[in-house]
């Protein structure tokens, strides 16, 4: 008997084993795993109610947020393909990617509706425009994410027929396009599932881990952390923007045990003034990739703070860890 390797199994496992455990901390929002699962189901059902169907591409343009995390599982369990966008790009880049990927629906953080409105008329295939905001009404010509969830069922959506296979697409992740246009890397359930297992093994991720999201979730599906940490039943502590003092405060308050980042973020942490005023009871693992950090950064992390350093390597085309 063969069992397909599906990324949706990570959330199902966490809900089954840890329904009352904290899954997400995002500002004032705290969701247990059963609550996260309900929001995921509501979004899946809302997207189906809009007429989206298996194989359709749905993009998300957002900084780190609980909305972003929800989108990974809500699209995957009904056979949609998620296209995460880099919110640092300009409108022309978004126009190219959205048309190249054949996106049918856009999920956009409230801060970024303007950049999409600039190119709305150049996106002939997009039929649905959904904005994620915690409160307030949606801007003109946008539908509210939370309003869609409120009107949708929290029950699991109908299972696709035939059942989703492990070699079906789960996301299309665009590279930076260093020498030409960005390339769309087509990730399957199997790609992302095995990468998550690689991450769990290499980083020693466990059920009592608490990850601080210093890494953008759009970056190759958060290097796979959206799947790996969820599958183990850990807690996601969301950071919308890099701020050294905020990072230390969240590590202290939430008991953060690891974070993934580029060397520039590590430097922001090390250069935070008056670091010793924070009472930190954990010994976080700082996982760095993207470029080799200076040896002095590693020494400072281990000597000044007593934290652990891990270096990893990968690229979008390998899902991404090697």
Label each PLM-derived region with a short phrase.
Residues 56-57, 63-83, 87-91, 99-105, ...:
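A short helix-loop-beta submotif of the ANL/AMP-binding
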Residues 114-166, 272-273:
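ANL superfamily adenylate-forming
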Residues 32-35, 170-194:
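Conserved AMP-binding A3 loop
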Residues 12, 20-65, 69-73, 90-95, ...:
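Conserved AMP-binding/adenylate-forming core of the ANL superfamily
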Residues 147, 231, 256-261, 270-322:
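Gly/Ser/Thr-rich phosphate-binding loop
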